[in-house]
A protein has these predicted regions:
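Single conserved hydrophobic/aromatic residue that forms the stacking wall/gate
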Residues: 222-233
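N-terminal intrinsically disordered, low-complexity tails
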Residues: 5-22
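Composition-driven recognition of glycine/serine/threonine/acidic- and proline-rich low-complexity segments
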Residues: 2-8, 28, 32-221
Length: 233
């Protein structure tokens, strides 16, 4: 043994290192911190908007940023659920998906219609999807305003599209959004609405879109207050 690696061994080492780098560099630690802060501020604004729609105290916790894929979502999340796609038309190029549990959508819809949040029998229909789309339009619209201030440019969204998803094991091509077929960024929040909702909501992002949002906001990491829960009442 002369201690000299063969070309095959060198190639194998390089390939292994490339694979590790690909996994590790989905987001850097600073990007994870930045998107967490962006989500924290944006969802705080959204909580205030939701309070005005349902007339109940709304609490949304500080976010937890992680990486996920379709198989993990299928295994971990309640079925069926509602996916709301939010696309950006100005200032950012991309989209994200907000995931809500079916029961939570029914409660929010009933409250928006002037009910007490208990009329949740039956399957989700067009009324529910229309109502939650409008709620998300207002919530994410207010979040876009906050994001505009952070990024110092105008951010606009397209009308959200809501769809019931049964979380099958197989993701059909073109279903919801193509980025779900690969590893994506998951941002989880705990949400409470009065004494009616005590649940988890998720935002799903393609990594490239997260990186775009994180540009120019690193200063927030040094000037923002400590993590906190947002409550609207």
């Amino acid at each position: 043994m002369d201690g000299v690696l063969s070309q095959e061994e060198i190639n194998a080492l390089l390939n292994n290192n490339d694979a590790a780098d690909s996994s590790d560099e989905i987001l850097t630690e600073s990007e994870k911190d930045a998107i967490g802060e962006i989500a924290n501020i944006s969802m705080g604004t959204a909580a205030t908007t939701l309070f005005s729609l349902v007339n109940r105290r709304v609490e949304i916790s500080t976010p937890v940023v992680s990486f996920s894929n379709w198989d993990k979502i299928v295994d971990e999340y309640e079925k069926p659920c509602v996916f709301i796609k939010i696309g950006y038309t100005q200032g950012l190029n991309g989209s994200n998906i907000l995931v809500l549990k079916e029961k939570d959508v029914k409660i929010i819809t009933d409250l928006m219609m002037g009910g007490d949040g208990t009329n949740i029998n039956g399957e989700i229909g067009e009324l529910h999807l229309s109502a939650i789309s409008e709620a998300m339009n207002q919530m994410m619209g207010s979040s876009a305003t906050s994001l505009s201030s952070m990024l110092n440019r105008t951010i606009d969204i397209s009308p959200p599209i809501a769809e019931v998803v049964d979380l099958k094991n197989t993701l059909n091509e073109g279903e919801i959004d193509s980025f779900l077929s690969e590893e994506f960024v998951k941002i989880s929040f705990h949400m409470e609405i009065g004494d009616l909702v005590d649940s988890e909501i998720m935002q799903l992002y393609p990594p490239a879109f997260v990186k775009e949002m994180c540009k120019g906001v690193s200063c927030l990491l040094y000037t923002s207050p400590s993590p906190r829960d947002y409550a609207a009442s």
